């Protein structure tokens, strides 16, 4: 899409992250897509309910599914003995992203293992048989130049055409140069990306009120509104999600008021493939 085309319209991609984390998430994704405004979901290929998520996705041919690369605070795809420098005894990444970022940048053997894990997750997604709509990372780790470089390099082998640019209007000033570098790198590589996101400042709290406020002040261009819906259940999905309002986020995606606000804003909806003209895999246009 040309710059002029972006400015001529408002286009929204509604994405659910952590698809596959739990069946409660998967059920919410299915409901929000069939009966609400959700257009896309990002799959965690090593998550406990990934198989269930994949089965649901195959039943939902208009749901655009991408790869949610997990390189922090989650389970790795490869066994621990293949990537011992990356994971703990249980095969999980920790959440000290600053320390890991330094290790990725300065230690060649760590970078090599990181590349192996990234490729393994791409390969696992390819084996699902689902078209790859987009790629993003858990906790936006692709803001790190080493991580981004490996994703761009490896993603070419798997038909990656679009990535999330985690650029929100209220981002801190110190982050703007990093966002600019990511944008430039994606543009040079010919990888499509959104112009802005909604969801960082209110992660876990993307309620109806938050969505209505965002929709009332939409800029022109391509926006991605991402959230973490799940149906009601016992206990937190993860330790880090204890305060997340998953059910309220699902209700927001199902809200007739939200759907009406999208129409009032003159915005169309779709996945990355729809928005950026890659719909040849399924032949569906933005709604």
Labelled PLM ranges:
Residues 1-16, 23-134, 145-287:
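Terminal accessory/targeting
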Residues 137-139:
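Active-site histidine-anchored catalytic micro-motif
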């Amino acid at each position: 899409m040309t710059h002029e085309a972006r400015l001529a319209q408002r286009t929204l991609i509604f994405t659910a992250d952590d698809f596959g984390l739990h069946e409660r998430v998967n059920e919410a994704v299915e409901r929000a897509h069939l009966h609400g405004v959700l257009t896309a979901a990002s799959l965690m290929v090593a998550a406990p309910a990934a198989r269930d998520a994949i089965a649901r996705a195959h039943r939902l041919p208009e749901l655009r599914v991408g790869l949610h690369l997990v390189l922090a605070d989650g389970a790795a795809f490869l066994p621990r003995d293949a990537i011992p420098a990356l994971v703990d005894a249980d095969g999980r990444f920790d959440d000290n992203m600053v320390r890991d970022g330094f290790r990725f940048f300065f230690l060649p053997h760590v970078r090599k293992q990181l590349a192996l894990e990234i490729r393994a997750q791409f390969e696992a997604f390819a084996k699902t048989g689902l078209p790859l709509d987009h790629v993003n990372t858990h906790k936006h780790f692709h803001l790190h130049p080493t991580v981004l470089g490996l994703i761009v390099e490896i993603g070419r082998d798997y038909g990656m055409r679009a990535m999330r640019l985690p650029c929100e209007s209220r981002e801190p000033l110190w982050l703007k140069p990093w966002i600019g570098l990511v944008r430039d790198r994606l543009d040079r590589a010919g990888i499509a990306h959104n112009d802005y996101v909604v969801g960082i400042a209110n992660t876990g709290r993307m309620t109806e009120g938050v969505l209505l406020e965002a929709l009332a002040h939409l800029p022109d261009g391509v926006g991605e509104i991402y959230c973490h819906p799940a149906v009601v259940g016992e206990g937190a999905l993860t330790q880090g999600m204890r305060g997340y309002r998953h059910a309220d986020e699902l209700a927001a995606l199902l809200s007739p008021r939200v759907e009406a606000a999208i129409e009032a804003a003159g915005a169309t909806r779709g996945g990355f493939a729809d928005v950026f003209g890659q719909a040849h895999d399924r032949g569906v246009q933005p709604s």
